[in-house]
A protein has these predicted regions:
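Active-site region of glycoside hydrolase catalytic domains
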Residues: 1-4
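Structured mid-domain segments that build the active-site/substrate or prosthetic-cofactor binding neighborhood
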Residues: 6, 12, 22-123, 129
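Short, charged, surface-exposed secondary-structure boundary motifs
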Residues: 13-17
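Catalytic domains of carbohydrate-active enzymes that cleave complex glycans
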Residues: 73, 99-172
Length: 172
């Protein structure tokens, strides 16, 4: 009759929970609880609370993290991914997380393409490129992605002037 609620609020988001120091502490706690209960509730975060509209390219980690939750007996999962005012691709993020909760083995790229085409129509290929370029820039920069982040912290990485020009080209 007891739920164990674990929150990964202090974890970075540019790589999966198993790939960063802050995430490893969370995983250790989750694995410890999973050894003694099958009743774990995970409260996960996927948006920048200080800057809701700032880019938050973490789509590439969603599946591995959700698989990890399932493997460790998370029977409940709350993914705080958008506020009442929306957020960076809030609808896409909600769609992907929801689909992955039902089927952690689903093809994320297919799900993303399906949603983008249905929601954005002819703009879908450009938005897909934008997402992929930004994810690559984040990973390549080596900078952390955090839920209380300033876009200024990414001015030499995913938001550097050359990439802003590239993003604008995709939107034109």
């Amino acid at each position: 009759n007891v739920n164990i609620m674990l929150c990964d609020i202090d974890c970075d988001r540019e790589v999966t929970l198993t790939e960063n120091a802050s995430g490893k502490e969370f995983v250790k706690a989750m694995e410890g609880w999973a050894a003694i209960t099958n009743n774990i509730f995970v409260w996960d975060y996927g948006i920048n609370f200080d800057n809701y509209l700032a880019p938050f390219p973490n789509f590439h980690i969603l599946q591995d993290n959700i698989r990890l939750f399932k493997k460790n007996h998370a029977t409940m999962h709350f993914s705080q991914i958008a506020g009442s005012r929306g957020g960076d691709f809030a609808e896409l993020r909600a769609y992907l997380v929801s689909k992955l909760m039902w089927n952690p083995e689903a093809n994320v790229d297919s799900l993303m393409q399906h949603f983008l085409h249905g929601y954005y129509g002819e703009a879908a290929p450009y938005l897909y490129q934008y997402i992929k370029v930004m994810e690559g820039a984040l990973i390549g920069s080596g900078q952390r992605l955090w839920i209380y982040d300033s876009p200024v912290s990414h001015k030499y990485g995913m938001l550097k002037p050359q990439l802003i020009r590239r993003y604008n080209q995709l939107f034109d």
